[in-house]
Structure formats: structure tokens, C-alpha cells
């Protein structure tokens, strides 16, 4: 185990308050900016154990057969993400950091993007390379040598909250993103309706895997510290509200529409590096 930095990594304040205690783990909130953080948290050695090969097979699956109907269904579930990035970039090189099995990248490839990924799991990396034919680099993003100013789109789907050093992750992104490239980040938000309604049972806490807990405000501020401006955002509909209204027969057809009026589990943003920061 190790302690989180004493000063908030976002604003530098040291004042904190307990946000939630779950399964003997404690998550605090910076009283100045609102960034949530796990403290104490797993050490680097423990992190490597947490993300052993079985992490994916225990929490997800063992990698779907690319010829199966289940695989095609899984790729269809990634299409909303592909549509999200295509609203700002129609083509180009996509790098997915924390790509897991590579399903999102496979969906992107089907839409004409050139794709590659990064992940710490040998199990998932091997599957992506051997079963899907997707080039994936094995290792921590800060330890890898990535091509400079090469990628048009860099994505982090539920990656940043796992990173022991999110500042380092953003520094890497800045170095390998093209001048006109975009960064896409998706993180759980503890300010969303789902978290606020479920709280203790909300799966976005995901202790001890999630080191950081964002709100839309802290995510935008974090990106700003690295010279990025948010140009597009997406607030997923509330699954809690959808399920609630879906149980009422007469309202079931409108449950999804009603749920869109409430913030959901996660927030996604597209950010671009400010022109004034590109030389820094």
C-alpha cells in the first residue's frame, strides 16, 4: 500500500473530506476543487498484480470468438463511441490507451480508421494481436516509446481513473498527438444521477482499481492544466432513471427519452490542444 499525494494533484490544496468508505477502502474529496481520490491506494507492485491476466477474464470475458454473433454484437455496442469521434474526425490514425481486448479499435477499423493500442495486460494484448490483428503495445503508457506527433485521435475510454499518474499520461498524449489531433476521454462521474442515486452501490467507485474520481468540472480543469480545451462533451443518459421508468408499462417506450434528461454513469469529452500551448 502507498499514500496518495498529500496535496491535490489538480489544485494543490491539502484540505480533504471523506467522500465514501467502501469495502474498507476510503475515497476522499479535495475540499477546494472536488477531485476525488483513493487513499491509501495499491502500490505499484500491487497494481501489477491487480491487472494480472485474470483481471479481464474475471471482470469481462476471455476474449470473444471473432467469428461469433456475440463478437458482432460487442462491436455494435462500440458504435456510439465511433460516432462520437467521427463528429470531429472522419478518418486518420487512432491510438486507444488502455484498449483491453481491442473491441473499440476493431469497430473503428471497420469504419476506415487506422488503429493501434496500448495496454498493460499481456492476456488482452495477445488476444488483440493474434485474434483481431490489431497492433497493440504491451506496457504502461509512460514507459513506452510512442511516435512523436503521429496520431490524429487518441482515446482513453475509462482509463484515466485507473492511472497512478494521470499527469504523465497527458504529457505522453501531448507528445504523440498531431497538431490538429484530438483527445477523447471518458470517465465515471460521481456527480452523475446514477452515482447520486445509488451512492454506496454505484459501480463507478470500483475500489481499488479507480484511483481518481472526476466531475465534469474537474476533468475540464485537469485538461486545461495541460493546455487542452474541450470542444465537445457527452453526458450519457441515466441507467437508473431508465430502469425506473421502464418498469411502468405505459411509460416504457419513453424511458430512454426520460433518462436522457438526467446525467448518467460517465462523461465523455473531446479536447484539442490550444494553439498557444503547442510549442510548450
Predicted regions and their residues:
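Conserved N-terminal segment of class I S-adenosyl-L-methionine
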Residues: 1-149, 153-157, 167-170, 234-238, ...
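S-adenosyl-L-methionine-dependent methyltransferase catalytic module, highlighting the catalytic core
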Residues: 142, 156, 164-172, 176, ...
Amino acid at each position: 500500500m502507498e499514500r496518495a499525494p498529500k496535496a491535490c494533484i489538480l489544485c494543490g490544496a491539502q484540505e480533504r473530506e471523506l467522500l465514501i468508505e467502501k469495502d474498507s477502502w476510503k475515497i476522499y474529496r479535495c475540499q477546494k476543487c472536488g477531485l476525488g481520490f483513493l487513499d491509501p491506494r495499491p502500490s505499484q507492485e500491487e497494481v501489477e498484480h491487480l491487472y494480472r491476466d485474470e483481471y479481464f477474464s474475471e471482470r469481462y470475458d476471455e476474449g470473444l470468438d471473432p467469428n461469433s454473433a456475440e463478437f458482432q454484437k460487442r462491436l455494435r455496442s462500440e458504435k456510439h463511441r465511433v460516432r462520437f469521434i467521427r463528429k470531429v474526425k472522419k478518418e486518420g490514425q487512432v491510438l486507444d490507451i488502455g484498449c483491453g481486448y481491442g473491441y473499440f479499435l476493431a469497430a473503428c477499423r471497420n469504419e476506415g480508421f487506422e488503429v493501434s493500442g496500448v495496454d498493460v495486460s499481456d492476456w488482452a494484448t495477445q488476444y488483440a494481436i493474434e485474434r483481431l490483428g490489431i497492433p497493440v503495445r504491451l506496457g504502461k503508457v509512460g514507459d513506452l516509446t510512442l511516435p512523436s506527433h503521429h496520431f490524429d485521435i487518441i482515446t482513453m475510454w475509462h482509463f484515466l481513473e485507473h492511472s497512478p499518474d494521470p499527469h504523465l499520461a497527458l504529457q505522453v498524449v501531448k507528445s504523440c498527438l498531431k497538431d490538429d489531433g484530438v483527445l477523447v476521454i471518458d470517465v465515471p462521474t460521481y456527480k452523475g444521477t446514477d452515482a447520486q442515486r445509488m451512492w454506496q452501490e454505484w459501480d463507478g467507485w470500483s475500489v481499488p482499481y479507480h484511483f481518481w474520481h472526476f466531475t465534469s468540472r474537474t476533468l475540464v480543469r485537469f485538461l486545461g492544466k495541460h493546455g487542452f480545451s474541450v470542444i465537445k462533451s457527452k453526458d450519457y443518459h441515466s441507467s437508473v432513471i431508465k430502469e425506473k421508468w421502464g418498469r411502468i408499462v405505459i411509460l416504457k417506450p419513453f424511458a430512454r427519452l426520460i433518462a436522457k434528461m438526467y446525467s448518467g454513469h460517465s462523461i465523455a469529452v473531446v479536447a484539442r490542444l490550444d494553439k498557444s500551448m503547442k510549442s510548450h
